[in-house]
Amino acid sequence: MKVGSGNVLLYWGYFTVLLSVVISSLIVYTQNYIWSWGWMLMFAVGPVISYKQRGCEPAVVTYTDKTISSVWQVFGCMFGLTFVLIAAFCVLYEQSVNFILMLPLSLLYCGLGVSINGIILREKWMIYSPVVAFVLVIYMLMSLINHGPVTVLWYLYFGLSFVVMMIIPGHILNKKAKKQCLKN
């Protein structure tokens, strides 16, 4: 494990929390859900993080590094495919495009990705940190199935789950990596 191992989790975590607070605030302040389109910035931050990480690539790429990278590539494709499929089905069924389903599915994808990374890295705290996100996924999906209200609080719940599932594990991972490097 190298110093900065948790940085990608921190980049995504802090960006998502900031975005959830900004979008929620704009919706509350303006009373207009058009600001929900701000979530599309999530698709823009991926290439920025990848570009920022490009200069930090290690000289030796381990099997673990490749596996973790592959896990996130698969989930990245799932995000994109989910977005395209939701839009396509809305057009197919002649419905207005509503991406609210992206919120619980994104939590599910990110939670699974973090848990799988925890399994690969053998870090129990990382395996189980997405439980908060999973509980919120079930809550959101049940609310959608039962035609419950989708409120601006969902965006804040989304941000909160990223604190628990990405920011905290990112800091713990960096601390462990730094401690391990100091031993060597």
Question: Which residue ranges define each predicted feature?
Answer:
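Structural signature of hydrophobic alpha-helical transmembrane segments
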Residues: I34-V45, Y93-L108, L156-L160
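Selected alpha-helical membrane-embedding segments in polytopic membrane proteins
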Residues: K2-V91
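Helical transmembrane-bundle signal
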Residues: T16-I23, F43-P47, F83-I86, L107-N117, ...
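C-terminal ends of transmembrane helices
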Residues: I49-K66, L112-L121, I167-N174
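Membrane-water interface of alpha-helical transmembrane segments
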Residues: K2-L10, Y33, S69, V97-P104, ...
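Hydrophobic alpha-helical transmembrane segments
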Residues: V22-Y29, F89-E94, V114-L121, Y139-H147
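Terminal transmembrane helical module of multi-pass membrane proteins
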Residues: I116-N184
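Membrane-proximal helix-loop-helix units in multi-pass membrane proteins
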Residues: F75-F134
